[in-house]
Amino acid sequence: PPHHSSAASDVYKRQGIIGAATAYFMSKEGRKVKVIERDPTYKTASFPLSLGGFRRQFFQKENILLGKFAREFIFQIPELLKTEKNPNPTASMVPNGYLLMFGPDHAEEQYRALENHKECEAGTKNIKGSELKKYFPYINEEGIETATFTDNKSEGWIDPFLFHSALKHKAIDLGAEFIKGEVKSLSEINAKTIISAAGCWTKELLEDIPVVPQKHTVFRV
């Protein structure tokens, strides 16, 4: 690929929904942004395979707060991401609470997580396994020590491809430039700030960064 030279204020990244989101937020702050994408069709990208869930039931406070921010952002997509060419952006949001169930071996860890939920005002409800049928009569409570869930306005899922498209179009509207190409070495890039959004391909570019691919399997029933 050609050498990408530009002013020192430029920011460079690589493809996918993280790249599009970063381009949006950086462009919104007035930064000059270029995104280098290996495959603009996203045929091998991770995000189109995602179920697109947004939730706040995590252990780490940072993840809980990120989940809360994601919810607020997603609910405002029609306003935040609209452009002249895309006046009605959507991510096909489906608000729906998440139910997480824990057996005796993992209940104690979840009780500790609930302390962070409370501190971060996650709005999580906690019940005993024996109470499950009161709320969810179709679930077998056998072997369940505790369960947590939220209401339908706190969590849910979106169409990740539509979300990416809305982010990308808004970033472009704000001045970001998306370039088809592949970065083989950081020496090819002349920029003040370089952000890698290569995901599971990170080690191909940054061998010293401890990011490795991990296979995930999803079953839809």
Language-model features: where?
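Glycine-rich Rossmann-fold phosphate-binding loop(s) that bind the pyrophosphate
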Residues: R14-G16
